[in-house]
Design a protein with these regions (language model features):
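Alpha-helical transmembrane segments of multi-pass small-molecule/ion transporters
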Residues: 1-310
Length: 310
């Protein structure tokens, strides 16, 4: 319960930053297009800094075991998410964007600052498993959903700055290559901005949406229910039955971090790729915005249930 309360407090802080981002646009100091500048900073500077800094730790058997578990969990969880997405697409006649939003979560932008605040920066390394698997699927499975078959670009996958930063971090971790203290501290300082910047971007995007249209859209609430409540409950049952949280070592915390990544709102990447590939970007933004606002209630509840059951 303590973790759930800490989570609720941190998500509330991030939600207030979302409202600040909305206020900047509503007051006409900025417009929603300016969010692209912050998105570029987050994608190409802040996120890589977080991942490289996360791997600047001692190479120990416990950490290796935790990393292996985080990658394995990421693969298993994504298999389940994709399977559930297909099932719900059929049952609820979801369109492409609704389908994508049920499968892909905002794990990087939201989970990293939450893990840093609740568990400490030394635990951020265990978010890398979920992020690297998800990033690979963004440019393969998600791209296929939005564009159709025959549109994979492996060069794009392998040269993605976030994938490269994880590879660099893993390489330095494996060979225990330590950055100079001043550089590592600089990366840590930049990385600390990931939550506020991501939430400002979210607020700026939400401010440009037609709120009346969103509030009256039953489909958006259906997607929010699937993404934030039903799918997390199904995954929670899987964690409970499998007993993976009780493997020993750091498994309990690693599994909790991985589960946290699956209960977060719809991925901002779905919105960004919808813009690029000619899908309904306004609808994608609406789903992203509503699930981001509602997660302040649903995420602490899911973590409280997790701690009570597991």
């Amino acid at each position: 319960m303590e973790t759930a309360l800490l989570l609720a407090g941190k998500i509330t802080e991030l939600t207030l930053i979302v409202l600040m981002g909305m206020a900047l646009v509503k007051s006409k100091l900025l417009n929603s297009e300016h969010s692209r500048t912050l998105s570029v900073i987050a994608l190409y500077l802040i996120s890589p800094s977080v991942m490289i800094h996360a791997f600047q730790i001692e190479n120990t058997p416990d950490i290796i075991d935790g990393l292996k578990l985080s990658v394995a969990l990421a693969v298993v969880f994504h298999i389940l998410l994709i399977a559930l997405g297909r099932l719900f697409k059929t049952l609820f006649k979801l369109d492409t964007l609704e389908h994508a939003a049920t499968v892909y979560t905002n794990s990087g932008n939201l989970i990293i600052p939450l893990v840093m605040s609740i568990f400490g920066p030394q635990w951020v390394i265990y978010t890398s498993g979920f992020i690297i698997v998800q990033m690979f699927l963004f440019w393969t499975h998600l791209r296929l959903l939005l564009c159709g078959r025959g549109n994979l670009a492996w060069k794009t996958v392998l040269t993605n700055i976030n994938i490269l930063s994880i590879f660099i971090g893993v390489f330095m971790f494996a060979f225990q290559i330590k950055l100079p203290h001043i550089i590592d501290n600089t990366l840590a300082t930049i990385g600390g901005m990931i939550g506020p910047v991501a939430m400002l971007v979210a607020g700026m995007l939400i401010a440009s949406l037609p709120l009346k249209e969103i509030v009256l859209s039953k489909r958006i609430y259906l997607v929010a229910f699937l993404r934030l409540i039903l799918i997390p409950l199904i995954l929670l049952v899987f964690v409970k039955i499998s007993g993976i949280a009780h493997l020993g070592g750091h498994s309990d915390t690693v599994v909790l971090i991985s589960f946290l990544a699956t209960v977060s709102p719809a991925a901002s990447t779905v919105t960004q790729m919808a813009m690029v590939y000619g899908q309904n970007a306004r609808k994608a933004s609406a789903i992203y915005g509503i699930t981001t606002l509602l997660c302040v209630i649903t995420m602490p509840l899911m973590i409280a249930l997790y701690q009570a059951m597991v």
